[in-house]
Amino acid sequence: MNPNQKIITIGSISIAIGIISLMLQIGNIISIWASHSIQTGSQNHTGICNQRIITYENSTWVNHTYVNINNTNVVAGKDKTSVTLAGNSSLCSISGWAIYTKDNSIRIGSKGDVFVIREPFISCSHLECKTFFLTQGALLNDKHSNGTVKDRSPYRALMSCPLGEAPSPYNSKFESVAWSASACHDGMGWLTIGISGPDNGAVAVLKYNGIITGTIKSWKKQILRTQESECVCMNGSCFTIMTDGPSNGAASYKIFKIEKGKVTKSIELNAPNFHYEECSCYPDTGTVMCVCRDNWHGSNRPWVSFNQNLDYQIGYICSGVFGDNPRPKDREGSCNPVTIDGADGVKGFSYKYGNGVWIGRTKSNRLRKGFEMIWDPNGWTNTDSDFSVKQDVVAITDWSGYSGSFVQHPELTGLDCIRPCFWVELVRGLPRENTTIWTSGSSISFCGVNSDTANWSWPDGAELPFTIDK
């Protein structure tokens, strides 16, 4: 090959390489442009990702699927149809309680970033269930956990996190500044009620889908407080009960009807010998039933039921299987307050089925330890202490605490009835475990089923003290 041929050959190869390089660059530019277009596309665009569709509603991601394209998370969304939770169905027939969730938050918090909390509760929309809780503005195993045995402080807030997960700064959503709270979903949006402020002038702030819609001022100036569990929504209206007045004597109790976060009606109960605190409420066949805490003089639980016009009935659970703590040993009951060991109390719940009642209670009648569910087939109206079913949930050697009801509507479950459920708070630390400087809790929950269930103990299980306590 002569020199001219060599030059021509080398030149041809160089041109070919240049053309190939140019084509690769053009392809890369097209790829980057296409990726950018996907990422910045309209939020209303619907994408199919492994045959799963993500739903976006009211600024809350309901179902998540992430697809990695060039190391960038792309989320597709579309509107989800809202419904109106009717609450007209009856409670599902059940024979026992199946374990639903356990968050193990104290165990996880010994090493991870987990909030110091109390008063957890669960509430469900037609799409999902969420855990709500009152944080102390502090993390477990941190210096700010010191002194969190205190109930009311300006650092407390109502927050929510996915069901069954330990509440942390990474998975939790702020709802309201509050040291007493409630929340519920009407099928279109979340109503939250957060009470904060001084004991003699606290205010309940109402929010609907995160926007302040109203306030309720303390009317007795004696620690306005509410349920510490879910409110009840039926046919577009939500209902809650608040207490204002002494915790050891007659107080004032009001039912509020709320629509899209605004109070449309309220009444004060005429209940001079009753005491209602921290009510656990649920819908049943178009009415609201609330089972509450008598902190004044009853070791059996008071109840109030009302319709959507706020016409109400009141009473005490008659059964000799007493539901409060402290309480006497089971004996002859009463449809009025049972005053033996009636002072003080703990938040709890029951479910009424005709003349029968499922009673949730601590296993200990003096300490907040253990938990059990008891079916008394005549206990709503009869005063004997006979029962036919007892299901163990937490052993008497392990700490429990508050408990409360929540329900799953047919719009969520696909059933033709309202499924009854409950949660139990498992409190650890002060005041009973004085090797710690803090007070917090984890939680478990159960739902009613008409099939086989287990008798066991699902305790908190954390080993104390923590590093911060030593």
UniProtKB/Swiss-Prot annotation:
Q: Enzyme class, one word?
A: hydrolase
Write down the glycosylated positions. Answer: N44, N58, N63, N70, N88, N146, N235, N434, N455
Where substrate binds, per the record, is at R118, R152, E277, E278, R293, R368
Ranges where the record places region Hypervariable stalk region: 36-90
Q: Which residues lie on this side of the membrane: Intravirion?
A: 1-6
- Membrane topology (Virion surface): 28-470
- A molecular function (GO) term: metal ion binding
Localization recorded for this chain is: Virion membrane; Host apical cell membrane
The protein's name: Neuraminidase
What's the encoding gene here?
NA
